[in-house]
Amino acid sequence: MTTPVASMAVIGAGSYGTALAITLARNGHPVVLWGHDPAHIAALEAARCNQAFLPDVRFPDTLSLESDLSRTLSASRDVLVVVPSHVFGDVLRQLRPHLRPDARLVWATKGLEAETGRLLQDVACEALGPDIPLAVISGPTFAKELAAGLPTAIAVASQDAAFAEVLQQLLHCGKSFRVYRNPDFIGVQLGGAVKNVIAIGAGMSDGIGFGANARTALITRGLAEMSRLGVALGADPATFMGMAGLGDLVLTCTDNQSRNRRFGIMLGQGMGVDEAQVQIGQVVEGYRNTKEVMSLAQRYGVEMPITEQIYQVLYCHKDVREAALSLLGRASRDENAR
């Protein structure tokens, strides 16, 4: 079987990968969506929709499906990776032998490398070499709303300005999907990881029943933690007031479509960490991200008290209420202190 030439190959047929593939195809671009399970891909092809995650959204005719990696990657120069952060490096190493010589890679994965806390750009350079153009897209996006064609805005960042412009043109749709370029490659990556952690904290607060005041305080101080860590890594602080920072943070902390927020709510209501993850039924990126962000903060000497207390709950069995009281009992300080 020959896979048709595509404007983009999307790696990862979960909810978000499928939604992005649908969006690209609706823009009139030929897209091939790859999944690792041939049976799953066959089911998607038969139904012409993703029954598990987006059952009401039909695939456009320009979206094709594939489970063979070689055929998928030969079809397109541009490759969009949408997989959980803890398998990101492994997936890239699988891709490498099949990539075209002119390949360019972008990811929508939000997080850091498991255990090491490295930015995904470093993982990608190690897995694919230093010469391939890299980019990241991030921002306040729920898969169901994106796939339904509801208005959405994101940021795209790359050290290759021409590639960023190509991605902006491929994704941008005047009716529903707005794409902003941002030159801050580090900041756009980091925002997507830290917001996952803070969203768990916001969920915990709501699960306890602390109310809107506490949730808003967590979001605001969480943004300060995100910015402090970002500046320490060389990011532009203005990025954290944009789509990949404040935008994604507010969305994930306030809407129950967020798995990280729902996970936190369950913990706040007294459920154990393992049981809550089972109840969610999909990857809770913030669980691993908490350990990774905490590692980065310690490495760079950045104070992140909210992240630290969430880490204590997730990995040290600290009671959620006790963690909240630890935050409230901290010494008074200047709001703008770094």
From Swiss-Prot:
Known EC number: 1.1.1.94
Annotated gene: gpsA
Domain of life: Bacteria
Residues engaged in binding sn-glycerol 3-phosphate: K110, G139, T141, K195, D248, S258, R259, N260
Known function: Catalyzes the reduction of the glycolytic intermediate dihydroxyacetone phosphate (DHAP) to sn-glycerol 3-phosphate (G3P), the key precursor for phospholipid synthesis.
Protein family per UniProt: Belongs to the NAD-dependent glycerol-3-phosphate dehydrogenase family.
Subcellular location: Cytoplasm
GO MF term set: glycerol-3-phosphate dehydrogenase [NAD(P)+] activity; NAD binding
Protein known as: Glycerol-3-phosphate dehydrogenase [NAD(P)+]
Catalytic activity of the protein: sn-glycerol 3-phosphate + NAD(+) = dihydroxyacetone phosphate + NADH + H(+); sn-glycerol 3-phosphate + NADP(+) = dihydroxyacetone phosphate + NADPH + H(+)
